[in-house]
Amino acid sequence: YFSAWPVLEKEVREGRMEWSKETCIALYDSLAEQVNQSFPAFMEQAFHCPREMGGLIKAGRETVADRGLFITKKRYAVNAIDIEGKRLDVEGKIGKTKATGLDLKRSDTPKVIQEFLLEILNKLLAGTGREEIVERIKEFKYEFTDRPGWEKGSPKRVNNLTKYGEEEKRLGKANMPGHVRAALNWNTMRRMQGDNYSMQIVDGMKVIVCKLKSNPLGWTSIAYPTDELHLPAWFRELPFDDSEMEATVVDGKVDNLLGVLDWDLGAATNTENQF
């Protein structure tokens, strides 16, 4: 991404240059055209590429945005007001959120968390201040706390389940990814309960991984198939570690998104010991 603001800030503040959305769009369109005009000469000088070949490569101005959140390389979100010549801040809209590489697009982020992250991101890019966003996060955390434990897990896809299961039988105890262990725990508990109705987890299946509190079996997590429509009573009665899952899927995801702002959201949105 590129911003001309650091170069032009002094002129704008001194009133020697107009700075508006239209000015920005025209400026960046002009920059893109100048890059295209100068590129063949650059290719010729740097790589001895014939000018007619260097002229085959054309760059286009993609997005102009008025606000942005830049976390790391290839992880950012902006409020786009123009994408490839199409204005988006029309008919009462402030623009369109364009996000890349963020948790709200990751498959291991629960759908309800994706929607919440998008909500607070939209608020931020619309100019909402810290206090209002903090209050919304706290409100959501109270709502999320009221959900049953199995709705607080993290989505995963289980691969090589058969391989790790056979290795476990052969060695007695085998090292494996945590979500695979959680899937095997579901299958084991299903057999222990004599449950022939619930789905068995097999290779390649999508599951939800839930953390567990200390228990006689020594398990730290258990998974269930996302396609299982009727969770059995034995599963719903397990000692889910709600606080651990809430910290992972709410606090962790919010920090990944907004931590770059240094707002100390962990302390500001703590809902424990409030009374």
Task: Please place each PLM-identified region on the residue numbering.
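DNA-dependent DNA polymerase catalytic subunits
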Residues: 1-275
